[in-house]
Amino acid sequence: MRQAEIERNTFETKIKLSLNLDAQDPVDIQTGVGFFDHMLTLFARHGRMSLVVKADGDLWVDSHHTVEDVGIVLGQALKEALGDKAGINRYGTSFVPMDETLGMASLDLSGRSFLVFDASFDNPKLGNFDTELIEEFFQALAFNVQMNLHLKILHGKNNHHKSESLFKATGRALREAITVNPDIHGVNSTKGML
């Protein structure tokens, strides 16, 4: 089974995360940030992976540390669960419509960290959630799993729909990339490693 459990404690956050790429349940996200919990649940469900997250952060400051640190730990868990990446597709792309919004995620589990984030939000807040933290989360995720991640909102107006489209698209693209392909022998790279 491709799985990982990671616990990370700092002065700002305490995070315990378990991930199983070959199971779909359970999915249980408890970060103390309701909107973020919703987005991570969508990510896991559309990525068809089991994800359990318990985070206690300094939410009296704001949710920045919690959101970023969950991205760090999730990236580390994905990297560990994927091991040497033998037999996986490596690449994944997904377009996800959400009413008037169309979002895209395209990624490469290359071992090279890079994020291109082409999405804007008309309001700085979604409820009490800072929309700038969406990019912070994906930056932390991409850099810690060591993947090249491109995210784009092709069109849309509603900020909730934009965010939901990006999280769903990333989950779906990741599922495509991590799927073991019987036609791939060894690692999907001319270098012989990722």
From Swiss-Prot:
Would you identify the family this protein belongs to, as annotated? Belongs to the imidazoleglycerol-phosphate dehydratase family.
The protein's annotated pathway: Amino-acid biosynthesis; L-histidine biosynthesis; L-histidine from 5-phospho-alpha-D-ribose 1-diphosphate: step 6/9
A Pfam family name for this chain? IGPD
Q: Which PANTHER family match?
A: IMIDAZOLEGLYCEROL-PHOSPHATE DEHYDRATASE (PTHR23133:SF2), IMIDAZOLEGLYCEROL-PHOSPHATE DEHYDRATASE HIS7 (PTHR23133)
UniProt keywords, alphabetically: Amino-acid biosynthesis, Cytoplasm, Histidine biosynthesis, Lyase
Annotated EC: 4.2.1.19
List, alphabetically, the SUPFAM superfamilies matched: Ribosomal protein S5 domain 2-like
Q: Name one GO cellular component term.
A: cytoplasm
The UniProt entry's GO biological process terms, in alphabetical order, are: L-histidine biosynthetic process
Localization terms from the record = Cytoplasm
Gene encoding the protein: hisB
Recorded GO MF terms: imidazoleglycerol-phosphate dehydratase activity
The source organism is: Streptococcus thermophilus (strain ATCC BAA-491 / LMD-9)
Per the record, the major location class is: cytoplasm
Name of the protein this chain belongs to: Imidazoleglycerol-phosphate dehydratase
Reaction equation(s) it catalyzes: D-erythro-1-(imidazol-4-yl)glycerol 3-phosphate = 3-(imidazol-4-yl)-2-oxopropyl phosphate + H2O
